[in-house]
């Protein structure tokens, strides 16, 4: 699973997932999986989608992961009263806005890429769409 190697601060404020996204173009591969909705993707979901794609294309071509889970999410154990400080870090998430390209792929036929991205999209908690690279 992906997580930061080291952070200046271990815990983070909740914050708000607003604004527009950077990384809206397919820049590395031929095909991409773009987020249509806004949300949080956990490191486990990113890895599960990557595995589904890799297995479907039988390790052909190349896959790029364009999101990184750098936001720590904390939680308190069950049946613990409130107060006594912020909970421990449970997992890491990547916050995504509409238009963000999540994965890219090249070296496989378009039909196979569409099928692989459909499998990956089933593992993700937000709506996605298939995009191709714009050639000038």
UniProtKB/Swiss-Prot annotation:
Pfam families: Ribosomal_L16 (PF00252). Keywords: Ribonucleoprotein, Ribosomal protein, RNA-binding, rRNA-binding, tRNA-binding. GO terms for molecular function: rRNA binding; structural constituent of ribosome; tRNA binding. It comes from the Bacteria. GO terms for cellular component: cytosolic large ribosomal subunit. InterPro entries: Ribosomal_uL16, Ribosomal_uL16_bact-type, Ribosomal_uL16_CS, Ribosomal_uL16_dom, Ribosomal_uL16_sf. One of its GO terms (biological process) is translation. Binds 23S rRNA and is also seen to make contacts with the A and possibly P site tRNAs. NCBIfam families: rplP_bact (TIGR01164). Belongs to the universal ribosomal protein uL16 family. HAMAP family: Ribosomal_uL16 (MF_01342). Part of the 50S ribosomal subunit. This is Large ribosomal subunit protein uL16.
């Amino acid at each position: 699973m992906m997580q930061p190697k080291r952070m200046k601060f271990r815990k983070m404020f909740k914050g708000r997932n607003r604004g527009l996204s950077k990384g809206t173009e397919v820049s590395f591969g031929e095909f991409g999986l773009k987020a249509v909705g806004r949300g949080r993707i956990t490191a486990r979901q990113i890895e599960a989608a990557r595995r589904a794609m890799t297995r479907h294309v039988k390790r052909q071509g190349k896959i790029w992961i364009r999101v990184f889970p750098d936001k720590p999410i904390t939680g308190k154990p069950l049946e613990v009263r409130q107060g006594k400080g912020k909970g421990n870090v449970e997992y890491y998430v990547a916050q995504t806005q509409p238009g963000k390209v999540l994965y890219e792929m090249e070296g496989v036929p378009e039909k196979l890429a569409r099928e692989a991205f459909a499998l990956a999209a089933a593992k993700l908690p937000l709506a996605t769409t298939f995009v191709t690279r714009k050639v000038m």
